[in-house]
């Protein structure tokens, strides 16, 4: 169990630096957001490849055209759209704001799960959605937007972050259908490659740079994002699930809003406005309510399974 909590801490640290690393690249201004995600996920996919190949052999998986189409859809949603939108978000707004808003993906997952997976929505879940959305509105600060204070860049960045969160939640729900069949390494490795291919096509068609713009100043950040955030971070997350449980491991996403904000202040020197702090608190409370509900349901399921096994 102690090993599991170490995995949770490492995952939280790696995942909390996603937007900060992206912001560092955005500040240098030499690379296109789509280009950044193509390179980063290509690195991550290559690192996960040996483990994916091993799992395919062990599980004797035979991927059909239907499987590849499904994995391609997941890759396009997660890599080509969601993560690219998140990179655009940090180009326009603060890394801390983008990180916190992206963490609301758990809230948007609930309605998608209801319509796609036919999962029931409990009253406490609705409460968590409302509390989290209040946090989003506070961060938006409608009064400030109406007055035109602070310019439009922040608002554009916030919109990109919310699009990233919504698309990621859709990806999360769709991935639930088959991820257990393939296993985490196979699922992510292949979907990463499909996402990279889609981005490569986009870059070529639109005449955007593919590898130009990479310098000694930004290559280390790209390598860090690809190796530690996309590959090692996910390996640690799977380790956390294995050593604890899926529900316990999900505390990573309770830690991220606060940790990402602190790291953005320390590393990027960002200043955080009062409304953002209040919004973060609401989003964390909403996440805690949702986590507590899931944990209770998981505990009841374990008790039910134990009782049926004993009888």
From Swiss-Prot:
SUPFAM superfamilies according to UniProt: Multidrug resistance efflux transporter EmrE
Chief place of localization: membrane
Entry membrane topology: Multi-pass membrane protein
Record domain EamA: where: 12-141, 166-292
UniProt key word Membrane: yes
Keywords recorded for this protein, A-Z: Cell membrane, Membrane, Repeat, Transmembrane, Transmembrane helix, Transport
Keyword Cell membrane tagged: yes
GO cellular component terms listed in the entry, alphabetical order: plasma membrane
UniProt record similarity statement: Belongs to the EamA transporter family.
Protein name per Swiss-Prot or TrEMBL: Uncharacterized transporter CKL_3017
Organism: Clostridium kluyveri (strain ATCC 8527 / DSM 555 / NBRC 12016 / NCIMB 10680 / K1)
């Amino acid at each position: 169990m102690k090993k599991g909590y170490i995995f949770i801490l490492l995952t939280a640290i790696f995942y909390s630096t996603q937007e900060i690393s992206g912001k560092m690249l955005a500040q240098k201004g030499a690379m296109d957001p789509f280009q950044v995600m193509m390179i980063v996920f290509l690195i991550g996919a290559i690192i996960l490849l040996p483990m994916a190949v091993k799992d395919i052999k062990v599980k004797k998986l035979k991927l059909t055209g239907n499987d590849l189409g499904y994995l391609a859809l997941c890759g396009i949603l997660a890599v080509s759209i969601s993560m690219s939108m998140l990179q655009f978000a940090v180009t326009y707004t603060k890394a801390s704001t983008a990180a916190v808003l992206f963490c609301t993906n758990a809230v948007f997952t609930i309605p998608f799960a209801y319509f796609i997976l036919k999962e029931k929505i409990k009253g406490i879940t609705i409460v968590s959605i409302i509390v989290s959305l209040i946090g989003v509105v506070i961060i938006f600060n409608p009064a400030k937007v109406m007055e035109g204070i602070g310019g439009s860049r922040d608002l554009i960045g916030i919109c990109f972050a919310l699009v990233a969160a919504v698309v990621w939640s859709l990806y999360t729900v769709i991935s639930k259908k088959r991820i257990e069949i393939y296993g985490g390494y196979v699922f992510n490795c292949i979907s990463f490659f499909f996402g990279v291919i889609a981005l490569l096509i986009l870059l070529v068609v639109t005449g955007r740079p593919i590898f130009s713009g990479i310098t000694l100043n930004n290559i280390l950040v790209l390598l860090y994002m690809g190796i530690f955030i996309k590959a090692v971070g996910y390996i640690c997350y799977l380790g956390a699930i294995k050593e604890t449980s899926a529900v316990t491991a999900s505390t990573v996403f309770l830690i991220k809003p606060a940790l990402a904000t602190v790291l953005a202040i320390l590393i990027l020197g960002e200043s955080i406005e009062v409304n953002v702090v209040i919004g973060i608190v609401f989003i964390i409370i909403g996440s805690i309510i949702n986590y507590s509900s899931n944990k209770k349901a998981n505990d009841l399921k374990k008790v039910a399974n134990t009782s049926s096994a004993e009888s």
